[in-house]
Every structure is written in structure tokens, then in C-alpha cells.
Amino acid sequence: MKTILVDAVDCFVSDTGEIYKEMHDLLETYQNKKIILTGANDEQFKKFGLDKMPYEVFTLKHNPEKTDSSYYEKMFENFGLTKDEVIYADCFFSL
């Protein structure tokens, strides 16, 4: 069963720390393990409420940024996963 990777801010949670109910409800329909991905540093982690998430949160504190492929290599290593064992949910909202 694949692990679901979910982008944190503006996908699973707002920049004020509010969990997007629709996304949470959707994810709860799957039995898969879920991991929230972010680049947040310690200050941002608290600001975005990432310390209160219902799933494990992974961050490298902007070192490197998520735009750098080494972020994902380190995340895979941390969780003992490969690219074939995950599905990545990144969201784009029209404001």
C-alpha cells in the first residue's frame, strides 16, 4: 500500500494553521499512511500549526528547499521509502 505524501501549507493547512476540512476528509477515506511535507523552520512550524497535525510531519527547515530533489531523497531515506512506494498530493487553489 502506497504512502500518501501531502503538501502542508496551502494544501492541507492554511497559512494560519486551519486544516482544510475537505482535504482531511478525503485523506481519511484511505487507509494508507499519510505524511505531511513542509520546508517550515521552527518558527513557521508553530505559526502554521504543524505541531497539531493528525499525521506525521516531515521538514528539513529550508535546508534544502522542497524545490530541490535532494529534499525528497532525504525524506525517502528517513522513512525507508522509494519513489515507487508513494503518491504525492500537491494542491493549487484559486483565491
Residue ranges of model-derived segments:
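Structural motif
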Residues: 3, 85-87
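Short, acidic loop-to-helix structural element flanking the phosphoryl-transfer center
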Residues: 12-35, 69-73
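Substrate-recognition "cap/lid" segment bordering the active-site pocket of phosphatases
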Residues: 42-85
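Conserved phosphate-coupling serine/threonine residues in phosphotransfer and NTP-handling enzymes
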Residues: 38-40
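Asp-based phosphoryl-transfer active-site loop
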Residues: 1-17
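Acidic, divalent-metal-coordinating active-site segment for phosphoryl/phosphodiester hydrolysis
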Residues: 90-95
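Short, well-ordered alpha-helix to beta-strand connector turns
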Residues: 1, 31, 54-55
